[in-house]
Amino acid sequence: MIDEVRELGIYTAYNANVDAIVNLNAEIIQRLIEEFGPDKIKRRLEEYPREINEPLDFVARLVHALKTGKPMAVPLVNEELHQWFDKTFKYDTERIGGQAGIIANILVGLKVKKVIAYTPFLPKRLAELFKEGILYPVVEEDKLVLKPIQSAYREGDPLKVNRIFEFRKGTRFKLGDEVIEVPHSGRFIVSSRFESISRIETKDELRKFLPEIGEMVDGAILSGYQGIRLQYSDGKDANYYLRRAKEDIRLLKKNKDIKIHVEFASIQDRRLRKKVVNNIFPMVDSVGMDEAEIAYILSVLGYSDLADRIFMYNRIEDAILGGMIILDELNFEILQVHTIYYLMYITHRDNPLSEEELMRSLDFGTILAATRASLGDINDPRDVKVGMSVPYNERSEYIKLRFEEAKRKLRLKEYKVVIVPTRLVPNPVSTVGLGDTISTGTFLSYLSLLRRHQ
């Protein structure tokens, strides 16, 4: 499978950012408390800021996360705080974040034949985190040119940095007279949410070359629609950017009917979620999501009872039923679902791949994820041997049993539904981007297996 996958060309867009990681210790935490004062922090904690406008908002929410030991994410809405964070903290590591960024680096790690990555903003700090071998499309003298992404950066482009503060169980610090011990390990994420970086689009000068890019590749993986806003200060809105997103898809397919996969991510705003789902899904061939995202989508399609059942009981039969509804209502080719214990495909009976081939495709996805979890990254196609040696998770027999029961209960005559247990690494080096890794592996293997039927 790996050799066939490497023969493919893939285009990926739109979202990439810098993940800057700080490993917190008692000294760093105490320094922050002394700088702002325990009384001010306690008062701000009582107000419980839901976004970060100034440093005190950050310190108060960080202390709350440390006291509870719960992972949390709070949006940073003041762009001027970039400088304060960069002066205050020494980052232990910086790595690529955002689905399109992570996926591009996975593709080039597998030595896929051609990897073209596009993000509307490419500042130098971001460009340097992409791996060697990734191409970025630019327009020079009214011609399309593919440049190494590291040299294609633009001075002055806005930067999206998500700052991840890792904390460890047992860390002790003082907040005034109160001694606090962190009860659980976790992370506190400060996610950048500025208007300047929320315009998910292909720039006008490049857009007319999308049919040419489509001819160069076998498939495209698109993501980042969750970054769109309902309204913008210049009068534009979500509808404007979704119209442009649909035009991008049409243009990519104009000269060559390439397969397009959308990697969905949770969208908290119900109105925006409905707009993205109804506008984008019917335009593409493949969609990837987890079971919670199935429930979120069902709720905006009018199936709130089934959505509630998925949230409450997490049963395979409900996930299958929900997946079939999404596939039919939004009329695309194949749905890929990734959960901690299993991966699933739902497609129509006339799909050219057999159920055995679909299972092989899913298995390739879980092999890639196990490889990344074991090694922290994928830098060579031979790395996948590590993932192949990871056994299926301990619930795999139970999952197969539940799946057989679900098949007896549901009417599946018009569908092909297959499930493969995941390969779980007991002590993963990294868990970041595992869903993106699964979707990359399943989509690549799906494309390569379809080629056999052409």
From Swiss-Prot:
Main location: cytoplasm
Cofactor field: Mg(2+)
A Pfam family annotated for this UniProt entry: ADP_PFK_GK
Listed pathway(s): Carbohydrate degradation; glycolysis
Key words, A-Z: Cytoplasm, Glycolysis, Kinase, Magnesium, Metal-binding, Transferase
GO cellular component, one term: cytoplasm
Listed EC numbers: 2.7.1.146
Spans traversing the lipid bilayer: none
Domain of life per record: Archaea
A GO BP annotation: glycolytic process
Cofactor mode of binding and number, as noted: Binds 1 Mg(2+) ion per subunit.
pH dependence: Optimum pH is 6.5.
Catalytic activity, reaction form: beta-D-fructose 6-phosphate + ADP = beta-D-fructose 1,6-bisphosphate + AMP + H(+)
Activity control summary: Inhibited by AMP and ATP.
Enzyme class: transferase
Active site: D436 (proton acceptor)
KW Transferase (keyword) present: yes
Entry-linked SUPFAM superfamilies: Ribokinase-like
Stored PANTHER family: ADP-DEPENDENT GLUCOKINASE
Assembly description: Homotetramer.
Family: Belongs to the carbohydrate kinase PfkC family.
Reported function: Catalyzes the phosphorylation of fructose 6-phosphate to fructose 1,6-bisphosphate using ADP as the phosphate donor. As a phosphoryl group donor, ADP can be replaced by GDP, ATP, and GTP to a limited extent.
Protein name: ADP-specific phosphofructokinase
Record organism: Pyrococcus furiosus (strain ATCC 43587 / DSM 3638 / JCM 8422 / Vc1)
Encoding gene, per UniProt annotation: pfkC
